[in-house]
Each structure stands twice: as structure tokens, then as C-alpha cells.
Amino acid sequence: FCLSRGLGDVYKRQEQGHPPYRKSHFDEEGDAWCYNAPTRSYYLHYFARQQPDLNWQNPEVRAEIYDILRFWLDKGVDGFRLDSIPYIAKDTSFPEIDLCKYPDVFPYYSLGPHLHDYLHEMNREVFSRYDCTTVGEGSKTSPEEGWKFIAPERQELDMLYHFGAADIRNETEADDPATGIPYSL
């Protein structure tokens, strides 16, 4: 996970001070950086503290992920739902975010420069060798960005779904905050 030391990973040593603020979606304290006393480092978790972000920049981490996927495919599973898949690639310079000016933090947390490289590699190394189905959860992705995940010629994922469509019945989320466009049927 993000405490791996090899390649300028997604962690910060205590001596470097607290990393730039990042909001955690599920952490009650709100901060996506969690201090780990034994390593004297912070690790990143955009969701629960028990879900450290993996460092997809590290090829050894990706190889381990592919081994795990192959293990389950060899056991006979028919496919995978890839939760919050846009978050696997991020800007690891972690620029300061003016939350008043940019309340939508999604672009800072996800859709990083190598996202589609990682997905194509995962397809090439694992999914293309099995008769399986892949479904990515792509909340807040635009239709144009969403197509990049599933376009057949890109060889990444089979399907992508968006919670915005699933939550259309919820009047408090009736409009897409990313685009300001009202939903209608």
C-alpha cells in the first residue's frame, strides 16, 4: 500500500511535516492522511482508514495486484467490479487545493496521468487471458471520460457505471454537481 518505500510513494515522512490537506470520503476525522506511528509516516486513504491507497506507480504493486486477480480467476470467478477505479492514478505532487475556489476535489484525487496506462496493462496482463467481465465504478467521470474506459479499441474495461444515474431518484442530488446539468428522462 502507500507506505511502500521504493519509488517516491504516496506517503510522507513525519519530518517533512503534515502533507497537504486531502478530504477523506469516509473518515470521521475527514483527513485522508493518517499518521502511522511505527513508521513515523503518513499514509493516504481517500476512503476508510482501513483502505490505504495503493501505489499504482510502483510496478511491483501492480504485479501483486495482477497475481491476486489471476488467483481468483483461476478459482473460477467470472469477473470483477473495480471500485472507485478513477482513483488509482492521481497527481502525487499533491498540490494545495483552495477548497473555497475548487469545492469539487475529484480532479485532484483521480484521473491521474497514467490511469488508462494502468488499466490497459491490467487488461493485457490479466483480463484478456480469461473469459471474464470487468465493471468499473466511475463516479463523477464525464461521458467523454467514461468512454475512454470502455472503448473496445482501448482494451481496458468491459463496462463502467456511474452512481449519478443510480441516484437519479434522490431529489437532493437531482442535478449533476460536476456539470450543473439537470438530469431528465
Kindly give the residue locations of the regions a language model identified:
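Single conserved hydrophobic/aromatic residue that forms the stacking wall/gate
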Residues: 1-11
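Poly-acidic low-complexity segments
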Residues: 36-37, 54-55, 112, 160-162, ...
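Conserved alpha/beta catalytic core and glycan-binding cleft of carbohydrate-active enzymes
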Residues: 9-22, 119, 123-185
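Active-site-adjacent "subsite" loops/lids of carbohydrate-active enzymes
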Residues: 9-75, 85
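Active-site neighborhood of glycoside hydrolase catalytic domains
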Residues: 56-144
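Short N-terminal secondary-structure initiator segments
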Residues: 5, 26-50, 138-160
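Active-site-proximal cap/lid insertion segments
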Residues: 38-40, 84, 100-111, 170-180
